[in-house]
């Protein structure tokens, strides 16, 4: 229950490693992006495994972060204001990273997801439309959008790593929380071998279901629509995000007014 911080660290390391390997074979161009992902899966040694681990690793990242936040809420970790606030920034940065990453394969749901979510900024009075066109780099989601999304997806994980160090620095100021909410000083034990072995056990227990998912049901959490290359002329019957954003999308769609939905989501 107290392990999810270390699991998030290993998730981040795994995602950066698999992501760098994928970036080596990816082409950030609307005409080539979809083909380059297919090429990675078909022709690159273990490319299919790297892609499956990266896609499902994102799901595990969100499972761990939601449990980590849930535990923090239950045990009052929000009282450590600096640690909590850096954690909130980390969550938002992670969501931004996952969103721009989902656009990169340039499948149908990638394209339409990018169109729908970036369009939300147009709900801002006066400057909204200008912001959207500035983000797109034109009058629709196109090549400039994909290029800048790839840049952001490459950059943001390193920003997350930096924020994680700040998060841990603030945590070390107060010491770790515990179920009783009292000082942990009297319970301090050597990091090695106790915590190191505990973390290795946690990593093993997380990698087992991740590998099972990546090897036996790699597309279980994905959208079949994304196996179709992006087509700006055909809207998918249901535009929906990955499971880890469904709560946000539900808030957004629960109010029948664009600005109202955006405000509810922001709140």
Curated annotation (Swiss-Prot):
Transmembrane domains' residue ranges: 4-24, 48-69, 84-104, 149-169, 197-217, 259-267
Main location: mitochondrion
Swiss-Prot/TrEMBL cofactor(s): heme b
Residues that, per the record, bind heme b b566: 68, 167
A molecular function (GO) term: ubiquinol-cytochrome-c reductase activity
SUPFAM superfamilies according to UniProt: a domain/subunit of cytochrome bc1 complex (Ubiquinol-cytochrome c reductase), Transmembrane di-heme cytochromes
Alphabetical list of Pfam families matching this protein: Cytochrom_B_C (PF00032), Cytochrome_B (PF00033)
Membrane-related topology note: Multi-pass membrane protein
GO biological-process terms attached to the record: mitochondrial electron transport, ubiquinol to cytochrome c
Cellular component GO terms held in the UniProt record: mitochondrial inner membrane
Superkingdom of the source species: Eukaryota
Subcellular location: Mitochondrion inner membrane
Cofactor: binding details: Binds 2 heme b groups non-covalently.
Binding site for a ubiquinone: 172
Keyword Membrane: yes
Misc. comment: Heme 1 (or BL or b562) is low-potential and absorbs at about 562 nm, and heme 2 (or BH or b566) is high-potential and absorbs at about 566 nm.
Role played: Component of the ubiquinol-cytochrome c reductase complex (complex III or cytochrome b-c1 complex) that is part of the mitochondrial respiratory chain. The b-c1 complex mediates electron transfer from ubiquinol to cytochrome c. Contributes to the generation of a proton gradient across the mitochondrial membrane that is then used for ATP synthesis.
Record note on quaternary structure: The cytochrome bc1 complex contains 11 subunits: 3 respiratory subunits (MT-CYB, CYC1 and UQCRFS1), 2 core proteins (UQCRC1 and UQCRC2) and 6 low-molecular weight proteins (UQCRH/QCR6, UQCRB/QCR7, UQCRQ/QCR8, UQCR10/QCR9, UQCR11/QCR10 and a cleavage product of UQCRFS1). This cytochrome bc1 complex then forms a dimer.
Entry similarity comment: Belongs to the cytochrome b family.
Name of the protein in its database record: Cytochrome b
Gene name, Swiss-Prot/TrEMBL: MT-CYB
